[in-house]
């Protein structure tokens, strides 16, 4: 923290040519799929639901396999290309970006980072095609980033873990088949041990609550998820036993470039809409773009967007270059990006 890695910034991060070529194809596909759907997005937002038929279109266009390695049927995007893709998606609809992002940024990220070869062989091909959609199940009524307050518990019985508890505000909860779940598996000196598990929807005892009626992102699925004495095979334990807190933090840090990319896309869309209106709107015989306050507002929007894109690019380069400690930088990019979008 506090050290500027010159080799990351000079020269400025550049995407590999082969990945850039694939990215351009994906962006063209996103424009083709989403470019004429504005009326649909508005309707779905009012209804608070994304139709299953449209989710199937996302599958067909390969948007659930962005970060899955090519060996398992995905596109193998690194963080920079992934963030750029979510930037494009978010220009059209935030609920769609969140659905894809929750799947790739956090839902299955633990499998990519900590999964065994057997686990990857078992799940990644289905996650790449969207046959399985992923969700990240950490938050509870009294616990979120404070993972130590988790009440969901898992007790080992032979080759299985008996998992019980309730998770809250789980993005993709209503459509997910694959859950990365965090539970207490013991204590040491009053401090809880947390372990991560892969839980699938078809396991007896897994159920979801109704779709949450949210203020925004209404078409994305957000639900409670309930685990009632779910018997999870020991083979589905993700990473090491009692190392779940570190796993959760690693997932969240690694996935934050996706959120940053989405905010950039939203900001660019807002800037385009604002400048269009400023050019068209006239008062007292002249365009409002000529007023100093309007110039200042639009200028600040562009500055914030530029700075956000630079921060997200830097964090993506840290991740893609193999740096192990980028937690502070990832957190900064998330806070700055979300606040910049709010100001915009």
Q: Predicted segment positions?
A:
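C-terminal helix-coil-helix/basic helical segment that borders enzyme active sites and/or dimer interfaces
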Residues: 42-45, 305-336
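Short Gly/Pro-enriched turn/cap motifs at secondary-structure boundaries
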Residues: 142-145, 169-172, 186-188, 214-221
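A short core secondary-structure module
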Residues: 164-208
